[in-house]
């Protein structure tokens, strides 16, 4: 189980934690930006669900309510709204990673070309 992280100060420890969760399929990364934004690049292995549709679309991923979910957008605002929406429907381990560049750095992942 992961607890909310309010300040990302120790990037190497956080990156190690995220990498461990992602490699063991205990976590998922979701890009909540618009499709137009995602076409400019997406973090490798992330899935795309626009923040306005997250409450409805999250069900197609068949996630457990306690599974770790890492969200990002352009600046952290929309991923913050998506975080609240997911918590309101019962997800307990949701983390807003902020903007795409910070999220990629924190996760130690590349930004790659989006393919549908």
Model-derived regions: residue spans:
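Rhodanese-like catalytic fold shared by cysteine-dependent sulfurtransferases
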Residues: 2-7, 27-28, 35-67, 77-116
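Sec-dependent signal peptide hydrophobic core
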Residues: 6-16
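Hydrophobic h-region of N-terminal signal peptides that target proteins for export
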Residues: 15-23
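Short linear Ser/Thr-Pro motifs
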Residues: 19-20, 75, 79
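Short, surface-exposed ligand- or partner-binding patches at beta-edge/loop junctions that are enriched
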Residues: 72
